[in-house]
């Protein structure tokens, strides 16, 4: 029998709330933390999962938790395994820009996300992509965008019709991040 995966999951009512029970059930031994109020203990975990949500609505609380953001950045730079989807990916970026200003996030990914009302654009639909000879499937739903040009993706993402879309997928050390909410995460990302 193999080792049980130990996963730390960011979770709260809105910033990191897009969690599916089947995903949680597949993640082995799970513990939760709230990035708005807690500094995570990342020692001894096998993976950090940052699900989607609305971090752009809670930037003040996330900014106040500088120790949390730094701990996650340090974990990523040491090669810690992270899966970040949509809002989780936004949290890993340099900053989130809202109508109220620019707010620093974890700084793992060198991009800025705009959540300004004038920049909103709906991105919605099923997505699939290949990475390391594995097919990933999921869905995308967000109004936020990258500030400036869309960053280069490590792979091409397609919609349900098989047409290419501009949704980037990022890899940094053991970090996998995208706007795509993935299905069967652990079956695919091993």
Regions found by a protein language model. Name each.
Residues 1-5, 10, 113-190:
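Amide-donor transfer/coupling interface in amidating biosynthetic enzymes
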Residues 3-6, 42-44, 76-78, 84-85, ...:
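Short gly/pro-enriched beta-turn/loop segments at secondary-structure junctions
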Residues 27-29, 79, 102-105, 135, ...:
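A generic structural signal for alpha->beta connector loops
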Residues 31-33, 84-85, 178:
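General beta-strand structural signal in soluble alpha/beta enzymes
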Residues 48, 85, 106, 141, ...:
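Hydrophobic, well-ordered secondary-structure elements that form the walls
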Residues 55-128:
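Cysteine-nucleophile active-site neighborhood
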